[in-house]
Curated annotation (Swiss-Prot):
Protein name, UniProt field: Envelope glycoprotein H
A single GO BP: symbiont entry into host cell
Region (Interaction with gL): 174-234
General function of this protein: The heterodimer glycoprotein H-glycoprotein L is required for the fusion of viral and plasma membranes leading to virus entry into the host cell. Following initial binding to host receptor, membrane fusion is mediated by the fusion machinery composed of gB and the heterodimer gH/gL. May also be involved in the fusion between the virion envelope and the outer nuclear membrane during virion morphogenesis.
Subunit structure: Interacts with glycoprotein L (gL); this interaction is necessary for the correct processing and cell surface expression of gH. The heterodimer gH/gL seems to interact with gB trimers during fusion.
Intravirion side: 693-694
Membrane topology, as annotated: Single-pass type I membrane protein
Taxonomic source organism: Human herpesvirus 6B (strain Z29)
Length: 694
């Protein structure tokens, strides 16, 4: 019965429409008693075209339902035959050859658990122990959050398909004049691109419930197929070659669909595409022709992530995969502005409840920064999340270990960069105690130095391709805006690597946050100011070529005329005030002696600068051991000369010049020296008396 209704609705536009009335009487006009045109309980429709007349009869009960009114609202019964014929030929019809793409067998390892294993419920998540490893069924935590109301699909589809009642998640992004909107449902994904030259709709997934209006047929829009899913392409044929050239060369689409069921392979593809986009300098360019491809792959990644590979998987692997997913979210959000909507996986939020005492469910490897990983997952949620003090303590220890490992100018590893990327995202986006925020920004920013810049340049040419996380450099820290194009050029020119400067500056522009809202003392600083900020526990130092902020300032006088260094100290809890003049001044003090006992200069920063090139690097000193290592002449870490100088920016806001005398730390305190001298004098006096007695 429903089939007959569909036939009627589909054929209505074909044969035009005539007014109709419902009658319970039988009429035999143009018929006979054995074949009546109208019968009780039925509605007769007469369609006329030239000399041809077609008659359809539909039970009246069907036309009185809500769905009938819904369907009639979706069709234009007054359209002329001329307009109807014109729009039939308007759309691009993909070639029939090479439509079928047989998905390869996923290479991802499939984990099969013994069905007799009983789950352990940990914070509402079912975990399955097997051979010392805990597993979780992916389907339990990868469910995308869909809106509670029915999704309103793109208006451009109204002409072609009947309305679809389905819940979805929706996110919209802008790139110049183009608008990119993703619709995610449990069965299919839609990428809708609004372009002044012509729109494009790409629909992928199980399209069984998508019904096209006459004269269109679904088969006319199928661009590619797998064994289970369709990729429909809806675009006017006049704009395909002009705006969407990747459609003509379907290699990109084919390669994507080859791995459509393998989430980790798709994540790898997107990482490679993202790195290429960065290295070409195309990120944030509204006219970049590759954005439609990026948006298509992005949609496929999220759709496959939320619907494929639903079986058991080790908990750590689930978390690491989600980490990778969030990193591509972060990258896309940086490249293409988000205007509306989010994509969230609410069940993943349950992992945020795990404390260090629960980490054995995730991994027994103590070297994995689990607290950092879990807190990084929290950056996906718009609402404030609460991170326990135990996690913050663990995060601080992780950062401190990385800093101590590389504070004296050693190369960061891929693993270190990945962890620093997560730590930087946490520092930039997760609310925390201000002291913690300041400390994280300080340590991450201080890992940027000339050695890191050269190492980063070499990494871009390494055989092992980086991903969107481990390509991160601490030079992208918001407190290191002094890492400018001219500074990078100076460093790379010395190393004969200046050809990579544009790539590095592009990456810095993408990964560096637009402001410093998390550190109140410097939140008023303009992002365009080439300043370095050092948020110490009790004071913040800003090093800049001009006056940029209210505080106690000091001008370095040893530099050449073309190089200006102004150091401004801002006391803790001071209101940030942007200024272009000197507010208050202080003198440069000379450091003559450093005690190794009381460590007056711990929690301070040693700054190296060049008379010509300006500030070069900063080293935060936490304890006396680090200070001894730094100033030990045998380590050659501080090598003053006629051009290179060192300043100590103290925790109380004072600035000291570290002379050659001051670089050598006294290994004993002055009091002990006095005691030793007194003992020696007494001993000599006793020896003298003894000799006299003899």
């Amino acid at each position: 019965m429903l089939f007959r209704l569909w036939v009627f609705v589909l054929l209505t536009p074909c044969y035009s429409w005539r007014p109709w009335t419902i009658s319970d009487e039988s009429h035999c006009k143009n018929g006979n008693s054995e074949n009546p045109i109208v019968r009780p309980g039925f509605i007769t429709f007469n369609f006329y075209t030239k000399n041809d007349t077609r008659i359809y009869q539909v039970p009246k009960c069907l036309l009185g339902s809500d769905i009938t009114y819904h369907l009639f609202d979706a069709i234009n019964t007054t359209e002329s035959l001329t307009n109807y014929e014109k729009r039939v030929t308007r759309f691009y019809e993909p070639p029939m050859n090479d439509i079928l793409r047989l998905s390869t067998v996923p290479a991802v390892k499939q984990f099969n658990l013994d069905h007799s294993i009983q789950p352990q419920i940990v914070y509402s998540l079912n975990l399955y122990p097997s051979h010392g490893i805990y597993y979780i069924r992916v389907v339990e935590v990868r469910q995308m959050q869909y809106d509670n109301v029915s999704c309103k699909l793109p208006n451009s589809l109204n002409e072609l398909i009947f309305p679809v009642q389905v819940r979805c998640a929706k996110i919209t992004r802008y790139a110049g004049e183009n608008i990119y909107t993703h619709f995610f449902t449990p069965d299919f994904m839609i990428l809708y691109i609004q372009n002044p030259a012509g729109d494009l709709t790409m629909m992928y997934g199980n399209t069984t419930d998508i019904n096209f209006k006459a004269p269109y047929r679904k088969s006319s829009f199928i661009f590619k197929q797998t064994l289970t899913d369709d990729l429909l392409l809806i675009v006017e044929k006049d704009v395909v070659d002009e705006e969407y050239r990747f459609i003509s060369d379907a290699t990109f689409v084919d390669e994507t669909l080859d791995d459509v069921d393998e989430v980790e392979a798709l994540l790898l593809k997107f990482n490679n595409l993202g790195i290429q986009t960065l290295l070409r300098g195309d990120c944030k360019k509204p006219d970049y022709a590759g954005i439609p491809q990026m948006m298509f792959l992005y949609g496929i990644v999220h759709f496959s992530y939320s619907t494929k590979n639903t079986g058991p998987m080790p908990v750590l692997r689930v978390l690491k995969t989600h980490e990778n997913l969030l990193s591509i979210d972060s990258f896309v959000n940086r490249c293409v502005n988000v205007s509306e909507g989010t994509i969230q996986y609410p069940k993943m939020k349950e992992f945020l409840k795990y404390e260090p005492s629960d980490y054995s469910y995730i991994t027994k490897n103590k070297s994995i920064p689990v607290s950092t990983l879990l807190t990084y997952l929290a950056t996906a949620y718009e609402t404030n999340v609460t991170i326990s003090r135990y996690k913050w303590s663990d995060i601080a220890n992780t950062l401190q270990k990385i800093y101590e490992k590389h504070m004296f100018f050693t190369n960061l590893t891929f693993s270190d960069r990945e962890t620093l990327f997560m730590l930087a995202e946490i520092a930039n986006f997760i609310p925390a105690d201000e002291r913690m925020q300041r400390h994280m920004q300080l340590l991450i920013g201080n890992l940027c130095n000339p050695v890191e810049i050269v190492s980063w340049a070499h990494m871009l040419t390494a055989d092992k391709a980086p991903n969107l996380e481990n390509i991160y450099s601490p030079c992208a820290s918001p407190v290191r805006r002094d890492v400018t194009n001219s500074f990078v050029k100076t460093v790379l020119t010395y190393a004969s690597l200046d050809r990579y400067r544009s790539d590095m500056m592009e990456m810095l522009s993408v990964y560096r946050p637009p402001d410093m809202a998390r550190v109140a003392a410097i939140q008023c600083l303009s992002p365009s100011e080439p300043a370095a900020s050092l948020p110490l526990p009790n004071v913040t130092f800003v090093i800049s070529p001009s006056y940029v902020i209210k505080g106690v300032s000091l001008t370095i006088t040893t530099t050449i005329v073309a190089t200006s260094i102004i150091i401004t100290a801002i006391p803790l809890n001071s209101t940030c005030v942007s200024t272009n003049y000197k507010y208050a001044g202080q003198d440069l003090l000379v450091l003559r002696n450093i005690s190794s006992q009381t460590c007056e200069f711990c929690q301070s920063v040693v700054m190296e600068y060049d008379d010509i090139d300006g500030p070069l690097q900063y080293i935060y000193i936490k304890n006396i051991d680090e200070l001894k290592t730094l100033t030990d002449p045998n380590n050659n870490l501080l090598v003053p000369n006629t051009r290179t100088h060192y300043l100590l920016l103290a925790k109380n806001g004072s600035v000291f010049e570290m002379s050659e005398v001051g670089i050598d730390i006294d290994q004993v305190s002055i009091i002990l020296v006095i005691i030793y001298v007194l003992i020696a004098i007494i001993a000599l006096f006793g020896l003298y008396r003894l000799i006299r007695l003899c």
